[in-house]
Structure formats: C-alpha cells, structure tokens
Amino acid sequence: MWGSGSVRCQNVAQASCSLTTFIAVKVYNTNARPACEFWISVKQNSARTPSTECFETNLHTVQISNEPSNETAALLSRWKSLTTEVDSKLENCIEKLSKRCPDVLREAMRYSLLSPGKRLRPILCLLGAEALGGSSFNAMANAAAVEMIHSYSLIHDDLPAMDDDDLRRGRPTCHIQFDEATAILAGDALQALAFETILSGNTDPSIAVKSCLVLAKAAGPEGMVGGQSDDLRAEKLGGGVEMLHAIHARKTGAIIQASVVLGGLAANATPEELEKLSIYGDCIGIAFQIVDDLLDVESTSENTGKRTGKDSERGKLTFPGIFGVRASRDRAAEFVEQAISIVDSFGPASTSLKQFARYITDRSH
C-alpha cells in the first residue's frame, strides 16, 4: 500500500521489448478518481518456459497524493459551517412539533432526518441563493424542506418492498431501527412537514407558493417517485440508455435540480437566472448519480455508509453496467463541465457553485 487510504489498480497498457514487459498501471482512490500512474517492468531472465523463479519485477515510478485541492478544501470548510446551520434548523423543526405528535414517530423522524449525512441538497440550495446575492438565512426554510423530502425518500426506498436495504449513512435503516409501519409513517410525516416548513418559513407568500410548486413537482409522479417506479420496473424488464437517463434524471436528478432552484427562488432570481440554475442542477444531478453508481462498484460499505455492490446483485440499470467504468467517469466529468459553464454568467459569485460541481466527481461517499 502506497500513501494513505484505499486504492485499486487497473492495468491500462502493456508493451514488450525483447524479454522485458512494461505494464502501465493506473491507481484510483476510493472516490474513483485517478491518484497516479506508474510503470512496472517484468524481465524474464531466460527464454525458457516462464516460471515464478525466472522473473525480475521492478516498480519504476510511484506518486500518490490524497490531499484535497485548495478549491475543494475551501468548499468543504464552507460546507461544514452551513451544515451546522442546517442541522440546527432541522432539529428546531422536530422540536417544535406539539405533543400531539406521538413520541415514537417524532424519534423515527429525528433518527432519519438528523442522521450523519452530507446535507448535499440543502447546501446546494443555500449556495444557489448566495450565488444570486441572496442570504443563506432567507433560503434556510427551503433548504430544510428539501432535506426532509430527501430523508422521506430514503426511508421509503430502504423498505423491503423497495430496495430492501438495512444500512443507511452508517446506521441501521429506519425500518430496522424501529419497524416498517413506523418507518412508513415517519416518511409520510417528513413529506408533509417539508411543505409546512416552506409555507411558514417564507415571509413572501409568492416565494412560498412557487417553492412548494417546484418541490412538489420534483418529488412527485413526474419526478422522484416516477423515477423510483421506473427503476423498480427496470429490475424486472431491463432497459437501455434511454431508460437509464430517464430514471436517474427523475429519481435522483429532480430533487438535486429543485434544490438549487429553491435557492434561486429565495433570492428573488429572475426567470432567466432560474433557467440557468435549472440546467446547472440537471447536469450535476446526472453527474452525482453516475458517481454514485461508480462508488457502488468500486467503494466499500465502510466508506459510503451503505451497502455496496447491491445494484449489480439486483440487476439495476447503472452507468457502469452499460458504459463501463472509464466511460462513466468521463461522462460525469462532461456533465460537471457543462454545469460550470452555465453559471459563468453569474460572475465571481458563482465560485461556490463551480466548486460544488467539481466536488461531485471528487467525492468519496
């Protein structure tokens, strides 16, 4: 093992010269990003039949760096600060529930909503608001709401009738920790609480109504729920590239896209600005899912906090399954570059959104 962290190796080229074979090896970190390339020479000492005794193997070059770039480090620092604010808001929303909410339901909601996670969607909402001159404070209700929708979707996705998962964010899933009925109700409750949070947290009624409409459409039958329905259907009937994109654009991409648009709404964005945020969100939503598919193939449960390898076991449509690992990684990078270019017109204020887009392909979980 060279350097720190887990790596995997891939033979990417091979050339022979006389009795010496040179093998180019590319090493990847657990985040599916190239860490280094090096050459190994394998010299056969004689022309006789090869055996384990007649080879000399030499490692010529090794260079590994697992340190995050300055750009990524800056984003992660800001991310940590905003996550604290988001978690405080989420905790407050749960604590404000009256005694009419049963204790077991409240605890199941809290267990899932406040479990350790990236808070990627609410952070994206807040960064979207800031990119257009708004404040994270004014966008916080929308940010909390989108995390509630995301948490509700995870609770339901993990159920035995859906993806049948027992591990989420490094902890037992909600239906394992409590029971199936409580998990279903906790998901239902978080969905309802999301819209209540938007309506009670936005002082401008117009922004509140528009925000509810965006989130409802993204989470509903034409968005996340529709994508999940097609995903389950594809496990039985199969599908191709068109179905793959249709599933992920809705199941994962729709809520990510809505997150940044909700930030724009909180910042009183113009229709043109909202359209650019929508395109940006669509691009990084697809990139995010591609990387998720790659992590399921190449990472570990300890690293991702959820069971890996399950997509191939269930016969799910995935980008690596159709395009292969290398082509999938290239596609993710292309979508990220498209996302970055679309927010260029926002000027210096778009820096955080650009950093966020690059993080999508750099992440390890």
Which residue stretches match the model-derived regions?
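Amphipathic alpha-helical interaction segments
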Residues: 104-107, 210, 214, 254, ...
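Transmembrane helix-loop-helix
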Residues: 201-214, 343
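Alpha-helical scaffolds flanking conserved acidic
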Residues: 135-146, 172, 209-214, 273-284
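Flexible, glycine/charged-enriched surface loops at secondary-structure junctions
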Residues: 294-297, 346-354
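Conserved N-terminal diphosphate/IPP-binding helix and adjacent helical/loop segment
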Residues: 2-145, 149, 155, 161-164, ...
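Solvent-exposed loop and edge beta-strand segments that line ligand/cofactor-binding
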Residues: 112-118, 179-183, 248-249, 328
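Acidic, Mg2+-coordinating active-site segments of isoprenoid diphosphate-utilizing enzymes
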Residues: 58-66, 130, 154-177, 186, ...
